[in-house]
Amino acid sequence: MAVNLQEHAHKLEDALRNSEEYKAIKDAYDKVKAHEESKKLFDEFRETQLKFQQMQMQGEQIEEEDLKKAQEQAQAIEKDENIAELMAAEQQMSQVFQEINQIIVKPLDEVYAD
């Protein structure tokens, strides 16, 4: 009987949705959305991050003015308790993803380990 990897992936998705890490992100993001200033800061910061990622992917230089704006946004975010909680929760989930990724790529690592 063939192993259905997509089926296992869906089970992993369900497990992630039921994890404490996911629930912590969801709760923290709900708090950010409930506070207008937090939501505004968060949205602006994400927009800046996406802009920088697109520029890097296209090989464009990031302007000094844009870097300064991003630094100011980061400082404002660090002071926002709601966003700080969300970022901490995201960090925890990122750790989970790293651990899962190590497990997933282990078979390939073993193939090339000689």
Swiss-Prot record:
Alphabetical list of Gene3D superfamilies matching this protein: YheA/YmcA-like
Pfam family, one: Com_YlbF
Family membership noted in the UniProt record: Belongs to the UPF0342 family.
Protein name: UPF0342 protein Sca_1419
